[in-house]
Regions:
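Short aromatic/hydrophobic "clamp" motif used to bind/position activated sugar donors
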Residues: 104
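A conserved acidic beta->alpha catalytic loop
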Residues: 57-66, 85, 108-114
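Membrane-embedded multi-pass helical conduit in multi-pass membrane proteins
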Residues: 266-345
Length: 387
C-alpha cells in the first residue's frame, strides 16, 4: 500500500480508487448487553469494499459466546475466534491473525461509530500512507455523573491535551483512539505487546512511530464512548490506567514526560501537605497554614477550572465536575506511583505465544460448549484486571 500525495486541508481528501477489503476486529468478554449492536453497526457500514468482522471472545460469565455464535450464524461476514486468556491485547492479536484482509479496523464491544466511519478511515489511510489512522473519542453520558465524566474526559483539565480526547487538526499524533491499520505495519512490529493489559494502544503506537511509521489523527473519525457511571468505577479505571502508563514508561523510558509526571507529583504534594498539616496543628497556626497551602491550592484550582469548563452543563452535572476531575487526577497519580507489581521483562513479541491458536466458531466438527474455557480459565491473575 503506497502513500498517495497528501491532500490539502482546503481540498479535503481526494477521490481514491476502489476501496480495499477490510477486516473489522474486536475482542470482547462479558458483553452480552452491547455485542449485537456493536457488530450490527459494523455490518451496516456504508462501505463500497468487501468487509468482514472477526470477534475474539474471552471466557465470559454471561451469554457473550452464544450471542457471538448467533451473529456468525446469521451473517457469513462474521467469524468468531477464541481468546482463552480473556486479555484484551491477546484477543486483539488473535483476531488480527485470523483476519483475511490487509486493512484492519479496530472497534470496541461497546463503542458506537457512524455509518461512514470505515470508509472515511480507509480513505485517510490510503491518502496519507499512515500505519494507523484514528480519530476522536467522544464520551457521552446520560446521568449527571456520566455527563460530568464526559466533560472532564474531553477537556485538558481532566485528561491532558491528547488530540483524540480534546480534538484538533488532522495530522501526525503520538497515539489515536482504537485505530485503522495497515496489516504490514502491524506485522512489522509484531502487533500488540501482550504484557500490557492496559495502555496497549499507546505502547503499540509508540513502537510504530519508533519504526518510522506515521500515526495519523483525523477528527472526522468520531467514536462514541460511554463513561463510567459512579466514583468507584471511575477511580478504579483511572488507577489502573496510571499503573499501566508507568509500566509503559518503565519499558520505554524515552516516553517519560511532564504530562505523565504531573498527576503523581500532585498526589505527593497533596498527601505530603495533608500529613504536614496534621503535624503542624500541634506546632502552631503558621506551620498549619504553610502545610495546607498545597492541598488548598489544588482544591481551589480544580474548582475554578471546573467552573470554566463546565459552565454550560446542567446544574446537577456541573456540581459533580470538581469531584470527577479530582478523582481522575488522584486515582491516576496514585496508580502511577503504585505501579504494577510484576515487572515487564522481555516483550511479549519475543516470547512464544501459547494457547493462541485461532478457533473458529461455529465449527460442527470441533466446537461444543464443554470444550470451551470456563469463565476465568487461562487468565493470569497476578496482573491487575483490565476494568
Amino acid at each position: 500500500m503506497s502513500p498517495s500525495p497528501r491532500p490539502s486541508d482546503a481540498d479535503g481528501y481526494r477521490s481514491l480508487p476502489a476501496l480495499p477489503p477490510v477486516t473489522v476486529f474486536l475482542t470482547v468478554r462479558d458483553e452480552e448487553r452491547h455485542l449485537t449492536a456493536a457488530v450490527e453497526q459494523v455490518l451496516a457500514q456504508d462501505y463500497a469494499g468487501e468487509l468482514e468482522v472477526v470477534v475474539a471472545v474471552g471466557p465470559s460469565r454471561d451469554r457473550t459466546r452464544e450471542i457471538a455464535d448467533e451473529l456468525a450464524a446469521r451473517d457469513a461476514r462474521v467469524r468468531v475466534v477464541d481468546n482463552p486468556t480473556g486479555r484484551t491485547p491477546a484477543g486483539l492479536n488473535i483476531a488480527i491473525r485470523a483476519a483475511r484482509h490487509d486493512v484492519l479496523v479496530r472497534v470496541d464491544g461497546h463503542s458506537e461509530i457512524d455509518a461512514s466511519y470505515v470508509a472515511a478511515a480507509v480513505e485517510t489511510l490510503l491518502a496519507t500512507g499512515a500505519a494507523n489512522v484514528g480519530g476522536l473519542m467522544v464520551p457521552v453520558g446520560t446521568t449527571p455523573f456520566e455527563e460530568a465524566v464526559a466533560r472532564a474526559m474531553s477537556s485538558s483539565i481532566g485528561i491532558g491535551s491528547a488530540s483524540f480526547h480534546t480534538g484538533g487538526a488532522a495530522g501526525p499524533a503520538p497515539t489515536v483512539y482504537l485505530g485503522v491499520f495497515r496489516r504490514d505495519a502491524l506485522e512489522r512490529v509484531d502487533g500488540y505487546d501482550e504484557h500490557f493489559v492496559r495502555a496497549q494502544d499507546w505502547e503499540l503506537n509508540h513502537r510504530l512511530r519508533e519504526a518510522g511509521e506515521v500515526v495519523w489523527f483525523d477528527p472526522r473519525l468520531a467514536v462514541t464512548y460511554r463513561p463510567r457511571g459512579d466514583v468507584r468505577a471511575l477511580a478504579r479505571q483511572f488507577f489502573r490506567s496510571g499503573q499501566w502508563r508507568r509500566q509503559v514508561m518503565r519499558h520505554h523510558p524515552e516516553t517519560a514526560g511532564l504530562r505523565y509526571l504531573t498527576p503523581p507529583a500532585a498526589v505527593v504534594g497533596i498527601v505530603g501537605g495533608a500529613a504536614l498539616a496534621v503535624v503542624g496543628a500541634t506546632a502552631g497556626p503558621t506551620w498549619l497554614v504553610a502545610a495546607a497551602a498545597v492541598p488548598a491550592a489544588y482544591v481551589v484550582g480544580v474548582v475554578a477550572a471546573s467552573a470554566v469548563v463546565g459552565r454550560d452543563l446542567r446544574p446537577a452535572a456541573r456540581v459533580r465536575l470538581p469531584l470527577v476531575v479530582a478523582t481522575m487526577h488522584v486515582a491516576w497519580g496514585s496508580g502511577f506511583l503504585r505501579g504494577v507489581a510484576r515487572k515487564v521483562g522481555r516483550s511479549a513479541r519475543d516470547l512464544p505465544r501459547q494457547g493462541h491458536t485461532a478457533v473458529l466458531y461455529p465449527d460442527p466438527a470441533t466446537s461444543s460448549p464443554d470444550a470451551r474455557p470456563a469463565p476465568g480459565e487461562g487468565r493470569d491473575h497476578r496482573l491487575p484486571a483490565e476494568d
